[in-house]
């Protein structure tokens, strides 16, 4: 049966992504001096204004104003004409320390039964997802959408298309036969630009020099693919001048483009004690290893935690009818192989390292440089599950 699925992405200059990057740059600055920093940093961006709030408890000495200016300048916000001037924008610091009530649960000073163990930083549910649609074990529509805005940013930074500005959004619709992507049926691409080029020039350039080269490796474009390029006809006003930005408003872009479920918690600006982030990374790690181990074609992992408790209150594995062993046996293997305590997740995925700003654009998943994208548990999973395999051999 033919079906369609659509996902979107946004550029590094999108106002919400500007905020995500500032929040994660603050986190990195803290972790680089104090790996045990407790950070929950939120950023708000509006016309000529960056406001940084949240809770930060750290021994690090950081300059929030300079961090915000550096991030904005790196993106390309160096003039009010393009949406923000990093040098002249106002930066307000409204941060304060983490609540001691939360801290005692995180650091093992809460209820006696959990004494001495790192507890989850909050309650919540987290999901991880993996599938065989792409080499990255990610949904094809989202990876295509990321590819368009990432390639546009590369051309902009290299000045190969000199009239490009930082703000942009993409959206890609993929046609499926079953769970197999067969073609791209539509591409929506809105790219901020200087006022000088004509719409005809903009449309032709964006299609021929950005969209087609970015998506050509997929082999999914065809003569019937429809292109919707800057559909309003003009996109000169962008960035925080055009739209307010806020940390954590692009959680679907950050994860699976809507194909996998989301627990609701955002990632950027949060240290690894916040299971919204760390457990979502672990859930992806588990799901990807299950699919890479050929135990299922598609897999979704749900974890749930209670604040201050040093282990998950639930684990659920969903394989959408594609498993080569029972889900109960896969779940048992996961419990045996993966350390799902907050402290264990941090150790396994090296989450005290200051690498978070690079996660804040083009998705937290499907990018091989991150530890949660490793497939180093494949053999362990295969050994644990092979005796219980259903019809069809589990590949080595």
From Swiss-Prot:
Q: How is the cofactor bound?
A: Binds 2 divalent ions per subunit.
Compartments where found: Cytoplasm
- Give cofactor(s), names only: Mg(2+); K(+)
Which reaction equations make up its catalytic activity?
L-methionine + ATP + H2O = S-adenosyl-L-methionine + phosphate + diphosphate
Q: Per the UniProt entry, what is one GO biological process?
A: one-carbon metabolic process
Source domain of life is Bacteria
* Residues reported to bind L-methionine: 55, 98, 243, 274
Quick one: where is this thing mainly located?
A: cytoplasm
Binding locations of ATP: 14, 167-169, 234-235, 243, 249-250, 266, 270
Q: In which pathway does it act?
A: Amino-acid biosynthesis; S-adenosyl-L-methionine biosynthesis; S-adenosyl-L-methionine from L-methionine: step 1/1
Specify which residues bind K(+) according to the UniProt entry for this protein. 42
Q: Which SUPFAM superfamilies match?
A: S-adenosylmethionine synthetase (SSF55973)
First-level EC class: transferase
Instruction: Kindly give the Pfam families that the UniProt entry links to this protein.
Output: S-AdoMet_synt_C (PF02773), S-AdoMet_synt_M (PF02772), S-AdoMet_synt_N (PF00438)
Q: Name one GO molecular function term.
A: methionine adenosyltransferase activity
Which CDD domains does its entry note?
S-AdoMet_synt (cd18079)
Sorted UniProt keywords: ATP-binding, Cytoplasm, Magnesium, Metal-binding, Nucleotide-binding, One-carbon metabolism, Potassium, Transferase
Where are the annotated segments for Flexible loop? 98-108
Output the InterPro entries linked to this UniProt entry.
ADOMET_SYNTHASE_CS, S-AdoMet_synt_C, S-AdoMet_synt_central, S-AdoMet_synt_N, S-AdoMet_synthetase, S-AdoMet_synthetase_sfam
Q: Where does Mg(2+) bind?
A: 16
**What EC number(s) are associated with this protein in UniProt?**
2.5.1.6
What are the annotated GO cellular component locations? cytoplasm
Question: What is its biological role?
Answer: Catalyzes the formation of S-adenosylmethionine (AdoMet) from methionine and ATP. The overall synthetic reaction is composed of two sequential steps, AdoMet formation and the subsequent tripolyphosphate hydrolysis which occurs prior to release of AdoMet from the enzyme.
Family recorded in the similarity comment: Belongs to the AdoMet synthase family.
| Quaternary structure and partners | Homotetramer; dimer of dimers.
Protein's name according to its UniProt entry: S-adenosylmethionine synthase
Q: What is the lineage of its organism?
A: Bacteria, Pseudomonadati, Spirochaetota, Spirochaetia, Spirochaetales
- The gene for this chain is metK
């Amino acid at each position: 049966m033919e079906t369609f699925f659509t996902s979107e992405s946004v550029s590094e200059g999108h106002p919400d992504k500007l905020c995500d990057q500032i929040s994660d740059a603050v986190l990195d600055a803290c972790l680089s001096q104090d790996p045990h920093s407790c950070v929950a940093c939120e950023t708000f961006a509006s016309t000529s204004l960056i406001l940084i709030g949240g809770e930060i408890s750290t021994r690090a000495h950081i300059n929030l104003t300079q961090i915000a200016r550096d991030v904005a300048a790196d993106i390309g916000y160096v003039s009010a004409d393009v949406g923000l001037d990093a040098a002249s924008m106002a930066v307000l610091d409204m941060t304060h320390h983490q609540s001691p009530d939360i801290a005692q649960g995180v650091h093992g000073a809460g209820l006696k039964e959990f004494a001495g163990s790192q507890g989850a930083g909050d309650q919540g549910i987290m999901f991880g997802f993996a599938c065989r649609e792409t080499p990255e074990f990610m949904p094809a529509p989202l990876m295509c959408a990321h590819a368009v805005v990432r390639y546009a940013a590369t051309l902009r930074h290299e000045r190969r298309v000199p009239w490009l500005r930082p703000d942009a959004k993409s959206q890609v619709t993929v046609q499926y036969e079953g769970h197999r992507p067969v073609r791209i049926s539509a591409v929506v691409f809105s790219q901020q630009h200087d006022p000088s080029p004509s719409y005809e020039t903009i449309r032709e350039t964006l299609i021929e020099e950005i969209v087609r080269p970015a998506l050509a490796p997929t082999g999914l474009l065809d003569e019937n693919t429809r292109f919707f390029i800057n559909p309003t006809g003009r996109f000169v006003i962008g960035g925080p001048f055009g739209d307010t930005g806020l940390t954590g408003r692009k959680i679907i872009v950050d994860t699976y483009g809507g194909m996998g479920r989301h627990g609701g918690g955002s990632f950027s600006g949060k240290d690894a004690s916040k299971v919204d982030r760390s457990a979502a990374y672990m859930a992806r790690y588990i799901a990807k290893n299950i699919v890479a181990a050929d135990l299922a074609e598609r897999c979704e992992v749900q974890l749930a935690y209670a604040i201050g408790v040093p282990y998950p209150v639930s684990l659920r594995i969903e394989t959408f009818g594609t498993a080569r062993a029972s889900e109960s046996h896969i779940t048992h293997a996961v419990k045996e192989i993966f350390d799902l305590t907050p402290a264990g997740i941090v150790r396994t995925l090296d989450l005290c390292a200051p690498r978070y700003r690079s996660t804040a654009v083009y998705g937290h998943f499907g990018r091989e440089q991150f530890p949660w994208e490793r497939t180093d548990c494949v053999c362990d999973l295969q050994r644990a599950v092979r005796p219980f395999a259903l019809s069809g051999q589990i590949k080595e």
